[in-house]
């Protein structure tokens, strides 16, 4: 432990493990520690089920009907991977995919007027969908064709829209789309949590809809993937990558002090020993005085013995409740997975509800989502602070990740990873570069 490292990483959340893997591949000497005895930090999957009961201080042990505790791997943070998104690219380029198995989520649903409807995943489904009327469908189709053909590098595809100036609100007007379709597009396809995006330049939204369509095109049922045995497999996959490249891992390591001299980090003290470093990466829990709270997220893990009604008995799905439908500023999400993903006992389903907290009574805010899940066998409620670093870390060389937000995919997490990478190295994160470095070491073409 009394050694000199290029980078020390504290916490084994997904952000930390990916950065640790990338830094190791880049030839840096990395020491990675976590005070917990398990991988994953805030984004861990908890097993056995008994540990989940203890964690949420639920008295007694799980009833017999829950099956064997070891058959459960319950995510603390509900997220899916966009099939064509940044995290999948990171997994492919680093070949961490060899440690993981994925399943396509069976469907995405959207809540409207108290009922849930399937988000169409084919042209035929779109035509048959009762989400919108016939004329609306034609206009919507025209809009989707425009988005599909849109190419940032080819102004001929802009059709009079300036992607850096025209707002999304004006683009919707141009295609004469009604409020329901706008809600559906912004929240179920572009996956925005609020309506702030309407007055922003439209290129970001167009790219998000493209990401959704391209992800959907890869597998057909939905744009989302989920790893067998739970999301806790992801940080472990990147930890393995780091280890292959000489990274050192230590779990169950109490961190006594982050040592700072003249405003810069020089090392970490643990169990009386000091490991020195040039840069430090950590999650907010290790540096409470260097982060600030910008909001809260409520998450409720629900154990069910039945698929969710009106989802065609799907054993995995996502439900989006757009904020307009329930008089809120931000959407409510439901992520559902089940025994089919080796995360629950046979015949059991796990549905996790999440949203950004807006009132003094967060549990009331998510009632519309819980009503869709009835009857619920057991609930585990958590309210977490959203923490962000107070500064960029370029002075102290302490680079702090953000806590996981209420979105149900990893795109914002990947943005944070790329952002920290740039702050640490001064250069943009380049997927292709990553691939070349790996091939140099493995000797592949």
UniProtKB/Swiss-Prot annotation:
Biological process, per Gene Ontology: negative regulation of cilium assembly; negative regulation of protein localization to cilium; protein transport; small GTPase-mediated signal transduction; vesicle-mediated transport
Question: N6-acetyllysine is carried by which residues?
Answer: 112, 269
Q: Which cell locations does it reside in?
A: Cytoplasm; Membrane; Golgi apparatus, trans-Golgi network
Q: Does the keyword Electron transport apply?
A: no
Q: Name one Pfam family in it.
A: GDI
Q: Which keywords does this Swiss-Prot/TrEMBL entry list?
A: Acetylation, Cytoplasm, Golgi apparatus, GTPase activation, Membrane, Phosphoprotein
Query: GO CC terms for this protein?
Result: Golgi apparatus; membrane
Locate the N6-succinyllysine modifications and list their residues: 57
The molecular function GO annotations come to: GTPase activator activity; Rab GDP-dissociation inhibitor activity
Sites bearing N-acetylmethionine, chain numbering: 1
InterPro entries (UniProt xref)? FAD/NAD-bd_sf (IPR036188), GDP_dissociation_inhibitor (IPR018203), RabGDI (IPR000806)
Residues bearing PTM Phosphoserine? 130, 382
Q: Membrane topology for this entry? A: Peripheral membrane protein
Which SUPFAM superfamilies does this UniProt record tie to the protein?
FAD/NAD(P)-binding domain (SSF51905)
Task: Give a short account of what the protein does.
Answer: GDP-dissociation inhibitor preventing the GDP to GTP exchange of most Rab proteins. By keeping these small GTPases in their inactive GDP-bound form regulates intracellular membrane trafficking. Negatively regulates protein transport to the cilium and ciliogenesis through the inhibition of RAB8A.
Say which family it is in. Answer: Belongs to the Rab GDI family.
How it assembles, according to the record, is: Interacts with RHOH. Interacts with the GDP-bound inactive forms of RAB3A, RAB3B, RAB3C, RAB5A, RAB5B, RAB5C, RAB8A, RAB8B, RAB10, RAB12, RAB35, and RAB43; binds RAB3D to a lesser extent. Interacts with DZIP1; this interaction negatively regulates the interaction of GDI2 with GDP-bound RAB8A.
What is the protein name for this chain?
A: Rab GDP dissociation inhibitor beta
């Amino acid at each position: 432990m009394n050694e000199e490292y290029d980078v020390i990483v504290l916490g084994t959340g997904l952000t930390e493990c990916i950065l640790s893997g990338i830094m190791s591949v880049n030839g840096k000497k990395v020491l990675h520690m976590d005070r917990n005895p398990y991988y994953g930090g805030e984004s861990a999957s908890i097993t056995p089920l008994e540990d989940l009961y203890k964690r949420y201080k639920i008295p007694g042990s799980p009833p017999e009907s829950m099956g064997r505790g070891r058959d459960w791997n319950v995510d603390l943070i509900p997220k899916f991977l966009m099939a064509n998104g940044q995290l999948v690219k990171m997994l492919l380029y680093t070949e961490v995919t060899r440690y993981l198995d994925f399943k396509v989520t069976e469907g995405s649903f959207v809540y409207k007027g108290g009922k849930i409807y399937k988000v169409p995943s084919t042209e035929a489904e779109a035509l048959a969908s009762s989400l919108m009327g016939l004329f609306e469908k034609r206009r919507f189709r025209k809009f989707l064709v425009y988005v599909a053909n849109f190419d940032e590098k080819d102004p001929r595809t802009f059709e009079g829209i300036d992607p850096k100036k025209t707002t999304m609100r004006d683009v919707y007007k141009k295609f004469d789309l009604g409020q329901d379709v706008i809600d559906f597009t912004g929240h179920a396809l572009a996956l925005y949590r609020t309506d702030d995006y309407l007055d922003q330049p439209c290129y970001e939204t167009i790219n998000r809809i493209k990401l959704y369509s391209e992800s959907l095109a890869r597998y057909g049922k939905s744009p989302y993937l989920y790893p067998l045995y739970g999301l806790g497999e992801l940080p472990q996959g990147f930890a393995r990558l780091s280890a292959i490249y000489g990274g050192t891992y230590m779990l169950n390591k109490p961190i006594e002090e982050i040592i700072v001299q003249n405003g810069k980090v020089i090392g970490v003290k643990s169990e009386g020993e000091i490991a020195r470093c040039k840069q430090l990466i950590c999650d907010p829990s290790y540096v409470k005085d260097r982060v600030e709270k910008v909001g809260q997220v409520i998450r409720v893990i629900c154990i069910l013995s039945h698929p969710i009604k009106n989802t065609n008995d799907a054993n995995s799905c996502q439900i989006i409740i757009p904020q307009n439908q329930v008089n809120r500023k931000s959407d409510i999400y439901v992520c559902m997975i089940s025994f089919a993903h080796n995360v629950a006992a046979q015949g059991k389903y796990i549905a996790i509800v999440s949203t950004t907290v807006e009132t003094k009574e967060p549990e009331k805010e998510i009632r519309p989502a819980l009503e869709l899940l009835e009857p619920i066998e057991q609930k585990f409620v958590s309210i977490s602070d959203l923490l962000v670093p107070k500064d960029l870390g370029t002075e102290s060389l302490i680079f702090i990740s953000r806590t996981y937000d209420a979105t149900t995919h990893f795109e914002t997490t990947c943005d944070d990873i790329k952002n920290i990478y740039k702050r640490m190295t001064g250069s943009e994160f380049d997927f292709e570069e990553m691939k070349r470095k790996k091939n140099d070491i493995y000797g592949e073409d």
